[in-house]
A protein has these predicted regions:
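Helix-breaking motifs and short loop linkers at transmembrane-helix boundaries and internal kinks
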Residues: 44, 76, 97-103, 245, ...
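Juxtamembrane intracellular "pre-TM" segments in multi-pass secondary transporters
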Residues: 2-8, 192-219, 406-408
Length: 413
């Protein structure tokens, strides 16, 4: 019957909870960025320290995205999802207890471990729960809350709370929702049939995952997108406060454009790529992202800063959703969605979310924070060159071109 062929009720409950969960990952990860100008005064941090604080989480995230993705393909989604969510929520609260750079780096590194394990596992769980016709839509919806919670609501919430409480208590407050959601996920999420007795037959070595041309290209493309957007996300608040001399409220308002633009981009672009094609949308997004990052660097008024940053991040964050969502899923061997996504996300995080902010912090410290925008721009331009070699995999686009449509990579069909 209809219910036996597809459980839509479970699909929407699971996707809703996983969407909220990934939004909280974004909030817990990025709430620190608008707090850094205030924290820097209390903890005596400089731009290099700020870049390192952002980078250490990205490096740990990258390594454990690779490990966690493969682990959840073997032992099950819930055994990775629930402990990871509890851990990163608690560690976000512990960030408020840091009394210096070393303790903050340690807390954020361990937080990156848990968030890295959660990320590809949550994408695979959304993929498991989604009807194939809604897979791209659901993955786009899920990933769109990362910038919405972390980079749109986060700066506004943080800068407004600072009027009443210290930055330490801001971290404590944002940790609570994740603990509640972990309980709801534990009650709701089911394991996919592919984790049963056929698991050992279906799994392939890493070399099999890398055989599809789009996997190594997606790794490079994600590095470029993350190097651009995470450099902006980490250092734009300090650029606005220190270089353009904006106050806390103005800085929070402009910085929120990163999140609102990213939310819309991750919500819209994966679906657009179903029609226009993965390759076309990816290349065009890198080009337009670079154009608007350049425009942001030339802007000085609040309206121009907000508008150019919003549109630039629409394309940049849309790239993150597109590369780690449908492009990764359609390049994955049968039954290895989480593992393949983990490799792509992990490599992108290590270099784009880890190494790039360290370099950006050094650039800001040595040459001036305004030059970090040039670094983001160069990364996006390189992304145009990389994605020009992608192979088209969108089923509707292939059908429109009269090309053969490959069978779905996911083991459930």
């Amino acid at each position: 019957m209809k219910d036996q062929s597809w459980d839509s009720s479970y699909e929407w409950k699971a996707v809703t909870l996983l969407t909220l969960g990934f939004g909280l990952v974004g909030l817990d990860r990025w709430i620190i960025a608008p707090l850094l100008p205030t924290m820097s005064r209390d903890l005596h941090l400089n731009y290099q320290d700020a870049g390192n604080i952002i980078a250490v989480l990205g490096l740990a995230w990258g390594v454990f995205a690779i490990i966690g993705g493969g682990l959840s393909d073997r032992i099950g989604r819930k055994k990775v999802l629930i402990p990871a969510m509890v851990a990163f929520s608690l560690l976000s609260g512990f960030s408020g207890m840091a009394n210096g750079l070393v303790s903050l780096l340690l807390i954020r590194a361990v937080m990156g471990v848990s968030e890295g394990a959660f990320c590809p596992t949550s994408f695979a769980t959304t993929n498991d729960a989604s009807k194939p016709a809604r897979r791209g839509l659901n993955l786009g919806i899920q990933q769109s809350t990362f910038p919405l919670f972390g980079l749109a609501f986060g700066p506004i919430v943080a800068t407004q709370l600072l009027r009443f409480i210290t930055w330490r208590w801001v971290f404590v407050l944002v940790a609570v929702p994740g603990l509640i959601l972990a309980v709801l996920l534990a009650i709701t999420i089911r394991e996919p049939p592919s984790l049963g007795t056929t698991d050992h037959v279906q799994r392939a070595p890493m070399s099999e995952m890398l055989r599809h041309r789009n996997v190594p290209l997606a790794m490079l493309a994600l590095f470029c997108a993350m190097a651009g957007i995470f450099t902006l996300s980490a250092l734009v608040p300090s650029y606005l406060a220190d270089y353009l001399k904006l106050g806390n409220t103005e800085q929070g308002l402009v910085t929120s454009a990163i999140g609102f633009g990213g939310f819309l981009g991750q919500l819209v672009l994966p679906g657009v790529s179903d029609v226009m094609g993965r390759k076309n949308v990816t290349v065009l997004s890198f080009i337009l992202g670079a154009v608007f990052v350049y425009a942001f660097a030339q802007s000085v008024t609040l309206g121009a800063l907000f508008a150019t940053l919003l549109v630039g991040c629409f394309f940049c964050f849309g790239l993150l959703g597109l590369i780690t969502g449908p492009i990764a899923a359609e390049a994955a061997p049968l039954g290895l969605i989480s593992s393949t996504t983990g490799i792509i996300v992990g490599s992108g995080e290590i270099f784009g979310g880890g190494v790039a902010p360290i370099i950006a912090g050094r650039v800001a410290q040595s040459f001036g924070i305004q030059h970090t925008l040039t670094m983001a721009l160069v990364a996006l331009i390189i992304g145009v060159l990389v994605t020009a070699f992608l192979r088209e995999t969108a089923p509707r686009r292939l059908a429109a071109l009269g090309a053969p449509v490959p069978s779905p990579s996911r083991s459930e069909g």
